[in-house]
Regions:
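C-terminal catalytic/substrate-binding lobe primarily of soluble NAD(P)-dependent oxidoreductases
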Residues: 1-212
């Protein structure tokens, strides 16, 4: 069923606590050359992703590209990073359950975010615990789209260039045989970038992924 995800245990695929902290953090967007601060889940809009993902709500999200890309590509005046609005974290945030401030519950003091993350399955269950059958099902039902849209001028005329990075963690069973997990959409680019840095003549200091 298209809504079966509502009853599935939420698991972002990495540290649940860090995921909630990121979602509940204010962030920035570069607008006309100046950074503008947005609240958590600010800038809500609908975005049309390629099928089968389709139309989804997206919001501003705390991510490094907001700062790295203007430093890498000189002249950039407008830039934002938006993430699809994960419903479970959005509801947790609205209820105050992403707070790291401790509250007193009977005779115990506890941070709401620690209660939530204690109930969420650990990420290793998702990373290393998936069976081939589960991965085959995910190949057919779970999809990821990452879209980069660049607008500017080319030859004096307005120009927009769009790049789409579809689901990287498929086919799941084959990736699991090679890497031990199918969730490689963060680790594989990181490993590839590390190899590129070793092979390229790069300046000393911090190297942004955008520079590669």
């Amino acid at each position: 069923h298209e809504y079966d995800w509502v009853l599935r245990p939420w698991n972002p695929g990495w540290s649940p606590k860090q995921a909630l902290i990121d979602c509940a953090s204010p962030t920035y967007a570069l607008e006309e050359g100046k950074y503008v601060k947005y609240p958590p889940f600010g800038g809500l809009e609908m975005w049309d992703f390629p099928e089968p993902v389709g139309r989804l709500p997206v919001t501003h999200h705390s991510h490094e590209e907001i700062y790295s890309m203007p430093a890498t590509f000189k002249g950039v005046k407008d830039l934002d990073f938006k993430y699809y609005m994960m419903y479970q974290p959005a509801i947790f945030y609205a209820m105050g359950l992403c707070s790291q401030e401790k509250v007193k519950v009977k005779d115990t003091e506890v941070a709401p975010i620690d209660v939530v993350t204690a109930m969420v399955p650990p990420p290793q269950n998702n990373i290393f615990g998936a069976t081939d059958k589960q991965l085959e099902y995910a190949d057919k039902t779970a999809f990821i789209e990452l879209v980069v849209e660049v607008s500017g001028e080319k030859d004096g005329k307005p120009f927009t260039w769009t790049a789409n990075c579809p689901k990287m963690n498929a086919p799941g069973p084959e990736l699991k045989k090679i890497y031990g997990t199918a969730l490689v959409y963060v680790s594989l680019p990181l490993a590839t970038g590390t190899m590129l840095i070793d092979e390229m003549d790069m300046p000393k200091g911090i190297i942004f992924a955008d520079q590669l």
